[in-house]
A protein has these predicted regions:
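Short, surface-exposed beta-strand/loop "edge" segments at domain boundaries and coil↔beta transitions
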Residues: 14-16, 60-62, 83-86
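Short, extreme N-terminal segment that most often corresponds to the first beta-strand
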Residues: 1-23
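C-terminal structural segments of small proteins and small subunits
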Residues: 76-77, 85
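Positively charged, polar, low-complexity stretches
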Residues: 18, 22-36, 99-100, 105
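Short, intrinsically disordered low-complexity segments
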Residues: 27-74
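Short, low-order "capping/linker" segments at domain edges
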Residues: 45-54, 58, 85-106
Length: 106
């Protein structure tokens, strides 16, 4: 099973988000894909963010690096499932403050 982890940031916080992203790239295996900064809300995601995509075998490592580097930002971790609403809600885990998702965009 594959997962996404989304680290959210305020539009005014782009520089710190970029630094956190670089930390993720340097501390995680190349098999963990770290996407670019997305500077707007997209789909159900309510704030700018960047996304990691990884296999289940990297779950513990990704979570540990996120906990160490997120600097108080909210992180949504969810499996990739056919039922996207369930993936983003009942099967999701938050690090930090949970944010209201725009589930009507799924």
């Amino acid at each position: 099973m594959n997962f996404h982890a989304h680290l959210f940031f305020a539009p005014s916080d782009q520089q710190t988000a970029s630094w956190i992203r670089e930390q993720m790239i340097s501390q995680l295996p190349e098999s963990v894909r770290v996407g670019p900064l997305l500077l707007r809300a997209a789909g159900p995601l309510p704030l700018p963010m960047f996304q990691l995509e990884y296999g289940e075998e990297f779950s513990q490592e990704v979570r540990q690096v996120m906990e160490n580097c997120r600097r108080g930002r909210s992180v949504l971790i969810h499996p990739l499932l056919a039922d996207e609403v369930a993936a983003h809600t009942v099967h999701a885990v938050w690090l930090g403050e949970p944010l209201p998702l725009r589930l009507d965009h799924l």
